[in-house]
Regions:
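Anion-binding alpha/beta catalytic cores of soluble intermediary-metabolism enzymes, centered on
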Residues: 1-249
Length: 249
């Protein structure tokens, strides 16, 4: 079954040699260029022109690719910030878990937290979760972060497409009797990164990762991610693209 129609941008000769060494037939369209920055530019241009619906990073630097992607001339940005959204299948949990943001926004302010929630809810909708339960994770201590989470929770209290609660601790967020959440919003990037990787390495879970908030889904898997995570991330990108990401942000 054909899921995507890939188009590769980069050094065609090197790609062919690598494919041959792996015993793989590279029977796909390749746009040849020896310059990785030019490859990034052409890939971004292809999604900007609607020739492609998903952007996936290959062997190029993330910073260089994103600096090109965010140029105003391509009109791929929206009013929201970009945030990393990961989707996890954990053997001990009865449904998928969406986590954000563990990879893009280092120390979000209130408006950025709103965007992070919006992006995560959008991904949850793409997964077929009509009214996701969103947990704003925290420790319960009285500090400025807790106050911000309370404000954030109240801002979403009249929404009909999601249920946002918090701040709430992780154990309550995952408890069937309490939260049984679909979406976990972490307080900062370090918590999101550690939580996401812990679910993969300690719980033997599966993960898919995308960057949401732009007019096309972006797949920025790291070199440490295995084939399964890359494949599942592509599937997630397809679901988001099919959900009409260009017209819903």
């Amino acid at each position: 079954m054909e899921i995507v129609e890939p188009v590769l941008f980069g050094n065609k000769e090197k790609m062919k040699l690598l494919a041959d060494s792996m015993g793989v037939t590279l029977d796909v369209e390749i746009i040849n260029t020896e310059d990785p920055i030019e490859a990034s530019r052409m890939a971004v241009e292809s999604v900007a022109k609607d020739d492609a619906g998903i952007l996936m990073k290959g062997m190029v630097k993330t910073g260089e690719l994103m600096s090109i992607f965010l140029r105003k001339e391509y009109n791929l940005r929206t009013e929201r910030i970009l945030s990393a959204v990961s989707v996890h299948e954990v053997p001990t949990y009865q449904k998928l878990i969406v986590i954000s943001d563990g990879g893009m926004v280092i120390s979000p302010n209130l408006q950025q937290r709103i965007d992070i929630v919006e992006n995560a809810v959008f991904v949850a909708h793409a997964l077929g979760i009509e009214k996701p339960r969103v947990a704003l994770l925290g420790t319960g201590k009285e500090d400025s972060l807790t106050a911000e989470m309370i404000i954030l929770s109240k801002m979403f209290q009249h929404r009909s497409d999601c249920i946002v609660d918090g701040p709430i601790t992780l154990d309550f967020a995952l408890s069937k009797e309490a939260g049984f959440s679909d979406v976990l919003i972490v307080p900062h990037i370090e918590a999101g990164n550690i939580l996401s990787k812990a679910l993969v390495y300690f719980s033997h879970g599966k993960a898919a990762i995308v960057v949401a908030g732009s007019r096309v889904p972006i797949i920025l898997t790291s070199r440490a991610d295995g084939e399964e995570t890359r494949f599942l991330s592509i599937l997630l990108g397809v679901l988001i693209a099919q959900n009409g990401v260009r017209s819903n942000v």
